[in-house]
Amino acid sequence: MAKDSSFDIVSKVEMQEVINAVHQAQKEIEQRFDFKNSKSSLELQDEKIILVSDDDFKLRNVIDILESKLVKRQVSLKALEYGKVQPAAGDTVRQEVKLVQGISQDKGKEINKLIKDSKIKVSSSIQGDQVRVTGKNKDDLQEVIALLRKQDLGIDLQFINYR
């Protein structure tokens, strides 16, 4: 009898790449002419990035710089969750950007429902912040991966432990 094949669906961010991208973005902000005499900065705190700038326009530029550095380091922008722009001390504005790690229960249920509705002969189960998909046929597993890549679930998905 053939052994069941499986893979895990996860949503993780490589933190070292985020750290590198934040440092590169901060360096670019310090060197750019349009940010001279500006209070613009980025700071990484645990699972969030704090953006500070003089006004909304410069804050938008800081976000653009950060996003370009993250993309260059292959960090998906779907892993970012932007908070509200808030006024801060000294006539500045600040914004928190959360790094979304793991698949929430709601997204896990949505993924399960998509897999079950597709009628592909596999089973899926939520295990903490990941979803495990098991099936007898590896082609069915490939089909599930293709199905999920086509869907826009609003989070970055990685497929790991393919066995």
UniProtKB/Swiss-Prot annotation:
Keyword Transferase appears in the UniProt entry: no
Q: A cellular component term (GO) from this record?
A: cytosol
A Pfam family (short name) is: DUF520
Give the CDD domains listed for this entry: YajQ_like
Keywords, sorted A to Z: Nucleotide-binding
Q: Which Gene3D superfamilies match?
A: 3.30.70.860, YajQ-like, domain 2 (3.30.70.990)
Q: Which GO terms describe its molecular function?
A: nucleotide binding
Top-rank taxon: Bacteria
User: What family does the entry list?
Assistant: Belongs to the YajQ family.
What role is this protein assigned?
Answer: Nucleotide-binding protein.
Q: Which PANTHER family match?
A: UPF0234 PROTEIN YAJQ
Q: What is this protein called?
A: Nucleotide-binding protein DSY1969
